[in-house]
């Protein structure tokens, strides 16, 4: 991959409901973090298929953010959302 290329980052965050954030845009709300994570990885995987690396960062119960899926190391489809 070109060293100047930008990696896509998808954030799964809780703000009254779970949402996916990427490039300043929010998804529709999700009731469950696992559903938002699954869809965030699917979106990140589409970027990967188009030649752009991507990862998914998930907000944990302690409000910290943790990497949960990375196109350079993780398989698709991913396992269930990791417990953070």
Where are these regions (language model features)?
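Short aromatic-glycine-(Arg/Gly/Cys) micro-motifs in beta-strand/loop hairpins
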Residues: 2-26
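Acidic, aromatic-enriched beta-alpha/helix-loop junctions
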Residues: 33-51
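Secondary-structure boundary/capping motif
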Residues: 19, 39, 66-70
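Short, solvent-exposed secondary-structure boundary motifs
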Residues: 1-7, 35, 47
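Short, mixed-charge low-complexity intrinsically disordered segments
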Residues: 49-84
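A short, exposed loop/beta-hairpin motif centered on an aromatic-Gly-Thr core
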Residues: 23-35
